């Protein structure tokens, strides 16, 4: 049996890191030979989680084909979000909770995707279905991933399953998930120590929409003014990436995790689909999006529909 690498998407968030750890553990218990790796360094929120549970960071890779022939993907499937040489390896497994786009394989594979708030919730179900015990430390990590993806169960992506899984994992990990969760989310909102490029790269994904490449970055904060006092510099950083990386449109979704409201900063063209998607007019390159916290559920589908209209 050949070794396989397990990894989440580029610019990994907490779920991308934890899901890789959890699914690798699960697969090894099922008899596979896997190693969890990452496509980037952990962000501040994820580092808080790793430190809290005394868990090492994953080894970071930029290529997979020089190590293995096959890989397992978690928390993503779109090739532009994956490892740079994804076309040169066989994808044997995918566990995800996102849309399927631009994904095809030459061989049959294991594919498990569910419309849940977090990939780690899907992986929890695999553990339960196969009677594999979740260790306390791993339960804490998986709990953290769900809190991160669902903004402490407040995001509209949250399902009843996510809520039930959080409560069960909290029991296994012996942790007060509400107190811990708020501290964890706040750990990821320290913006002053980061450059504008770091802010827009930390949690960003690319999407193909009607022939246009749209980059959507999300910045979590406890005060939107902390983001927009740097608007000019953020716009400049986004313009630089549009030019260097071939993005047509760069959207920066600044989200207040305390009151569940967002502001969208729009850099590039076309802007008409953005206005159509949200039924609003862009002013000073910005749109107010009250009640919007989820890129996956409240931004990308609306943009995709508007671009395809």
UniProtKB/Swiss-Prot annotation:
GO terms for cellular component: cytoplasm. It catalyses: diphosphate + H2O = 2 phosphate + H(+). Its cofactor is Mn(2+). Gene3D superfamilies: DHHA2 domain (3.10.310.20), inorganic pyrophosphatase (n-terminal core) (3.90.1640.10). Mn(2+) 2 binds at residues 15, 75, 97, 149. Mn(2+) 1 binds at residues 9, 13, 75. It comes from the Bacteria. SMART domains: DHHA2 (SM01131). The keyword Acyltransferase does not apply. It is found in: Cytoplasm. Binds 2 manganese ions per subunit. Keywords: Cytoplasm, Hydrolase, Manganese, Metal-binding. NCBIfam families: PRK05427.1 (NF003877). Belongs to the PPase class C family. This is Probable manganese-dependent inorganic pyrophosphatase. The gene is ppaC.
